[in-house]
Every structure is written in C-alpha cells, then in structure tokens.
C-alpha cells in the first residue's frame, strides 16, 4: 500500500504528548479530509470514537497503541511507522445498525463497530422478548441485559459476558445474555451476519432499560432492532505480523 498523505489524530490531554510530539516531527501530515490514511494515537476507545467521527470519509484507519489494551491498535514503532503502514494488511469491518424506540415514541439510529448492548437501568432485572428474522425465539429473557457483537467486538464486552470469540471472516454475530437469570442455563446464540435481531422490552415502567451502540447511549427504550450493514464498511490497517485475525485466534487460547 503506497501512502503519501497521512493525517494524525491524538488526544491533546494525553500523558504521552512527548512521544506524540516526536512522531509529529518525523513525518509531514495533511488535513484529515485529504488523507489516504488516518493515524490514531491512543487506545481502543480513542480509535472507536474517531472511526465513528470520520468513517463517512471512507479512509483507512491505522491505530498506534499508547493505551492499556489496544486490541484494535498496532504497537508503537516510531522509526518504522510509515514502512509499517506501507506493508500493512487491511481488515474490513461491517458495523451494526441499531434502531431504537423510546417510551416517548422517538426513533433513533446509531452504528456500532463492537457491539450493541441493552441493560437494566435500575436494581431490577430487565425483561425482554427476542425475535430473530421476525420469528420469536424467546418469549421472556430475565437478565441484567444482552448484547449483539460483531466478530471484531466479540473479544471485548462480549467475551467478558462469557460470549464466544468469532473469527473475523466468520460472517456471524454473537447474541449473548448479560447475567441471565431465566432461562438460567441459556448462554446465547450464534447467528448469521444477515440476521435481524429485535428486542422488545417488557414492563418498561417498572423495569426501565437503556441501550448503547458502542459508546452512544439511549435511555428508556421500548424496543431495539439490530442488523449488520455493509453500506458503511470500515477499513482498519494492521502490521503484517500483527493482524487482527491473528489476535482473535490468540485470544481464544488465552493469549
């Protein structure tokens, strides 16, 4: 991949400003709208926020890890930064499209790279009904919540909720309960990425529920519809010896 124009994004309040200033001195940067690659310095959260902000530009993202985990990031190598980008591999991520309705009758939509989650707002467990492709699959799930995760997001919140890790090219989604109370032994489902999942919230007055698409939250919802969309693909660049697919495989073996 031959790259001549790169843009640099970072948190100006970062504790790593000395490192960032060093990177800035080594290379010439352009405006984000003119870039062939957007470099994001920080952690997974910084990258996700900027993907949401600039994904409409259809420019590949290259993350440089200065955070804690950095699952979607590349290790810092100041001197070889451009060479690593030139030699990088591309992973295509298809986000989730979430549509929610709230108790005031308002309809909202949002995109998620990692997951869409719904969760109880009070100390009482949430109750909801689940449909897949218009067919009722569970008439009542009692739990702290539930989530739908993409393959890229399956090793994040989904894994913490005891959901499975999906290979990046699997064309599947994880439907995972969060602290399921009833049915107690239900651990979720693996669905084709073409599936449309709908959650209908039961008893919304007594058991209010919120929903999030990655970090964007909606309050007091009555129903949520989730499906994968190929209309807004996201291109992430990874070092050739440190691909996202390799990381997902490694994570399954406790790496």
From Swiss-Prot:
Q: Which domain of life is it from?
A: Bacteria
Q: Please give one Pfam family short name.
A: NAD_kinase_C
- The UniProt record gives the binding positions of NAD(+) as 44-45, 49, 114-115, 144, 152, 155-160, 216
- The positions flagged as active site in the entry are 44 (proton acceptor)
Q: Does the keyword Cytoplasm apply?
A: yes
Which Gene Ontology CC terms are recorded?
cytoplasm
- Gene Ontology biological process: NAD metabolic process; NADP biosynthetic process
Q: What class of enzyme is it?
A: transferase
Q: What is its EC number?
A: 2.7.1.23
Provide the catalytic activity annotation.
NAD(+) + ATP = ADP + NADP(+) + H(+)
Subcellular compartments: Cytoplasm
Gene Ontology MF terms: ATP binding; metal ion binding; NAD binding; NAD+ kinase activity
Entry cofactors: a divalent metal cation
What keywords are assigned to this protein?
ATP-binding, Cytoplasm, Kinase, NAD, NADP, Nucleotide-binding, Transferase
For the keyword NADP, the answer is: yes
| Family annotation (SUPFAM superfamilies) | NAD kinase/diacylglycerol kinase-like
Q: Which family does it belong to?
A: Belongs to the NAD kinase family.
Function recorded in the entry:
Involved in the regulation of the intracellular balance of NAD and NADP, and is a key enzyme in the biosynthesis of NADP. Catalyzes specifically the phosphorylation on 2'-hydroxyl of the adenosine moiety of NAD to yield NADP.
The protein, known as: NAD kinase
């Amino acid at each position: 991949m031959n790259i001549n124009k790169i843009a640099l994004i970072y948190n100006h309040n970062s504790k790593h400003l000395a490192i960032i200033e060093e990177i800035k001195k080594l290379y010439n940067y352009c405006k984000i709208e003119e870039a062939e690659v957007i470099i994001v310095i920080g952690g997974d959260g910084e990258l996700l926020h900027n993907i949401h902000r600039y994904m409409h530009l259809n420019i590949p993202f290259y993350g440089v890890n200065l955070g804690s985990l950095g699952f979607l990031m590349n290790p810092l190598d100041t001197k070889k930064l451009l060479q690593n980008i030139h030699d990088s591999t591309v992973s295509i991520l298809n986000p989730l499209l979430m549509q929610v309705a709230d108790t005031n009758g308002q309809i909202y939509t949002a995109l998620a790279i990692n997951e869409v989650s719904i969760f109880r707002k009070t100390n009482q467990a949430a109750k909801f009904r689940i449909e897949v492709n218009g067919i009722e699959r569970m008439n009542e799930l009692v739990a702290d919540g539930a989530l739908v995760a993409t393959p890229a997001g399956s090793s994040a919140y989904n894994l913490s909720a005891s959901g499975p890790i999906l290979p990046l090219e699997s064309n599947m989604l994880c439907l995972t309960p969060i602290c399921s109370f009833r049915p107690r032994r239900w651990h979720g489902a693996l669905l084709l990425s073409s599936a449309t999942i709908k959650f209908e919230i039961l008893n919304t007055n007594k058991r209010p529920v919120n929903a999030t698409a990655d970090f964007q939250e909606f309050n007091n919802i009555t129903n949520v519809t989730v499906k994968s969309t190929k209309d807004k693909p996201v291109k992430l660049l990874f070092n050739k010896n440190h691909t996202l697919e390799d990381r997902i495989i490694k994570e399954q073996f406790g790496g």
